[in-house]
Structures are given as C-alpha cells and as structure tokens.
C-alpha cells in the first residue's frame, strides 16, 4: 500500500468519525472515561502478536492483553516498515492478512489520533463476556 493510500484511509476514516462524534459526543465520553475503545479481532490480534514478538500467532498469549497508545503506534510503525513482502512473510500476519492488516492499521491510527487516545483498553481475540481478562464493564452494555 502506498503512503498516499494509507493516509487516504486515515483521512476518510476521520471524516466519518467527525460525523459520528458530532452526533453522539464520543470524544467527550472518552475524556470523561465513559467510553472505552475495545478491539476484538482482526488487526488488533495481529498488533498484539507483533507487540509480543510471538514466533507465530498464539491466541492464548494475545487474548486479554492491553497495549498503551504509544506502544500501538510503535507496532503500527513496525508493521508499516515491514512492507508488503515482510508482512506476507511474518508468521503472525501472512499472505492472507497482509493487505487487511495494513488497512486496519490505518483505521486504528485514525481512531487513536482523532480521539487523542493515549491508552486504549484492548481485549484481543474472542473477548468472552464471562472472562476476567476482558476490560469491559458489562453492566454498561445494552
């Protein structure tokens, strides 16, 4: 993916987030700690695996971890710097997830920068509702 394409995904995502935020006041809710960012599968599981430097994807190692905003940024930079060939060869990404992962990284980067998230809560993989590792207060879900 070119830098232009990556940045276009960020810009378009932030445009959609602006409309969403204006309608629902998400930024204010995040600042008041009433709203959390939760990632449940896909790109976030890859970010977790790469962050942990796993030799191959291991669901039990990734499930339930949290990654700080600065660490998410570092992992995204690492994945971007791999290039397509590097992502395809990476044991936690591979050829089937390479394109989706880099697109997902752009979307996550858009979320983090748009809402100034410095420490998103992240529950990886299945995020079972009865799991103690899931950082969601289930009483607030409707």
PLM regions and their residue ranges:
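Helical "lid/coupling" subdomains associated with nucleotide-phosphate turnover
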Residues: 1-142
């Amino acid at each position: 993916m070119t830098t232009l394409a990556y940045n276009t995904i960020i810009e378009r995502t932030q445009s959609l987030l602006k409309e969403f935020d204006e309608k629902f006041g998400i930024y204010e809710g995040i600042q008041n700690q009433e709203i959390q960012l939760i990632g449940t599968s896909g790109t976030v599981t890859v970010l977790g695996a790469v962050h942990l430097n796993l030799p191959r994807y291991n669901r039990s190692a990734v499930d339930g971890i949290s990654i700080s905003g600065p660490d998410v940024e570092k992992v995204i930079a690492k994945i971007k710097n791999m290039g397509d060939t590097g992502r395809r060869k990476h044991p936690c990404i591979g050829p089937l997830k390479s394109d989706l992962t880099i697109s997902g990284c752009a979307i996550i980067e858009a979320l983090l920068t748009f809402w100034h998230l410095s420490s998103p809560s992240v529950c990886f993989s299945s995020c079972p509702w009865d799991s103690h590792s899931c950082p969601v207060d289930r009483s607030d879900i409707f």
